């Protein structure tokens, strides 16, 4: 069973001033809003496509995909990067390495240890996109080499973050060539390192990170869409977690369902081939509520859904996500990209 941190994402001075950021960039704000109205990529809130395996995934390095899976990522939305260039990734690696070393020299909270040589590596994630027009995703890693491990030349990964845009190419078309739109950022590692690196990106590319909370409404959609995915074999039980506010402390309820039973339930309410509708999501969740009430006499509709876990992925309202299935990597990221774009608008 996955464990999730109860701590919220690190607060940053600019995070709470997202609207202020757009006040100083009014033309960009207008273009983003226009994109949302005109874009045919983002379906209406009442209807979405069932995630499918993308042909572009064939370009993804299998080792990099394996590294992305089965890790708990904290998700953020990110405003467009100004003057970012893929041809300068080596320079960014050098500059960020120097920045981290300088911050550590100042005695700031940089969790890299005492006896390590730190290096930062920027690399592209080819194939992590929805269409050819989406900007390339890229990965940032903080690696270290201790005195004792130099003979073996094995680097230890201390922190990882990646930036992507999946089926969000219309957003890129609304901004000038000086901006690169990668609205979804995922981080794994010490929160202090996330804050430090986020600060460097904000200063270097005039962008703004904001923690991406996932609502109970969004979790219901995730549960339905991921249950609808056809699996070659199921790797995990389908689980739901609800929070019950009560005194003196909150009560949590977990509900585990065999994945084949969950799929059978979904098939019984699913009527629109290739799509998921709001009505089907509501029916799916209401059937779960009714079944639970019949057995335990508890009204789950009076509680708050805080986490869902399937063989495709798991997600928490705290903005934590874990992708479990390579086949549906792009499908999961597409929905997360949509949520990130809606948040920055």
Curated annotation (Swiss-Prot):
A GO CC term? nucleus
Q: Where does the source fall among the domains of life?
A: Eukaryota
Where mainly found?
Answer: nucleus
Alphabetically sorted, this entry's keywords are:
Centromere, Chromosome, Nucleus, Phosphoprotein
Residues modified as Phosphoserine are 40, 54
Give the intrachain disulfide bonds: none
| Keyword Phosphoprotein set for record | yes
**Location in or out of the cell:** Nucleus; Chromosome, Centromere
Pfam families per the UniProt record, alphabetical = CENP-L
Summarizing the function annotation, the protein's role is: Component of the CENPA-CAD (nucleosome distal) complex, a complex recruited to centromeres which is involved in assembly of kinetochore proteins, mitotic progression and chromosome segregation. May be involved in incorporation of newly synthesized CENPA into centromeres via its interaction with the CENPA-NAC complex.
This protein's assembly is summarised as:
Component of the CENPA-CAD complex, composed of CENPI, CENPK, CENPL, CENPO, CENPP, CENPQ, CENPR and CENPS. The CENPA-CAD complex interacts with the CENPA-NAC complex, at least composed of CENPA, CENPC, CENPH, CENPM, CENPN, CENPT and CENPU.
Q: Which family does it belong to?
A: Belongs to the CENP-L/IML3 family.
Quote the PANTHER family the UniProt record gives: CENTROMERE PROTEIN L
Please state what the protein is called: Centromere protein L
Gene this chain is encoded by: Cenpl
